[in-house]
Amino acid sequence: VALRHDRNRNLAHDGTMATRSTFVYSSAALRRMLGLPTSVPVQMREFWDVIWVWVKGDRPTFVSKTDFKRHFVERRQTEAQSLKVTDWLRDPPHYTVTNPATGSQHLVVEHRDRLDCDCEDYHWQQQFIGRGCCKHGYAVLQYLGFDSLQDFIQANLNGE
């Protein structure tokens, strides 16, 4: 799947530059995790395995990077549940994933060790993390009967 590059695509929603760290450890993710409105000011600093967090009006605290990563995956898995998967019945397997609410469609191509998608989220996961799975990939995994990308990879490596 060929991806076009747009130099403005790595801008976060607030106009700041997205980086390897802010892609997963973002203030937006923190607000979702804590159930805070988007208007609440937060400050974050990255350390080895935790994120120092200060929410206006509260004492500073630490949030585990593992919690951010879990939120990153679970959010995409949840969003995948409302998507519709169409199997092209080709080799290698191709799928069209449609969002019924918006009508948007994305192409997902299955490989033994990954699912490639033409969406922006997958593109940035590849660039910043080196691997990944977007909500469209998780929709295909659910369609194929897998709970996680790791289960899918293991099944393919074991020849199931």
Feature roles, as predicted:
Residues 2-160:
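Long, low-complexity, compositionally biased intrinsically disordered regions
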